[in-house]
């Protein structure tokens, strides 16, 4: 399997992916969904064969997150996280019924333990702590197609 690491630039995430994705109707894995805004763009722009969405939708209140984008906000409230999850299920209801979207309410580590699929695109925007990002990258490398791309967000 050929691995090429490069830093690419585009005016936005969708353009970056369009410039580099070499397959139509890709299998896509998105790690870190939050409210699903980017997930909605992925389904509309790429018409994936299947879109896998992975997020635990858990409110972390640890001091580690206190000064992060995630801490001290609605993102650290479990009721809000539950609402985000339910809203996402409602939005993707048709796609879930058609078996074009799978929503996994679990950590990416838990997802990868039982995953048997390979992906043309893996978009990583999960837990931003170094050890989690590192694991997401290492796990993703095991499940990406030869011409697939892995995109890291912030």
What are these regions (language model features)?
Residues 2-5, 14-154:
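S-adenosylmethionine/decaboxylated-SAM
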